[in-house]
């Protein structure tokens, strides 16, 4: 069985709560997630905002990365989205959520995808 996957790259703000909630499955005892957030510093320098761009192949590459974990029988759903464009401090840049039968499996998959 291969897990359901939902991936994307968007310039729209990410609704992290909805994306994470969309990973839930009745067959799973765990949903592990990661939210990458724009911080106010990098390398000792202040940051006021960040500009993300993506290569045209980025959606396919993200899907390929996620697919590596989708074939694991204990993973049932993977959601992975990345934001591009102008992001302010505190905005979500990346959301990954994995529904798996057990927490250790979900955490391992999230870590591998990120």
Which positions does each model-derived feature cover?
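N-terminal, polar/charged subdomain of small-to-medium soluble alpha/beta proteins
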Residues: 1-94, 99-114
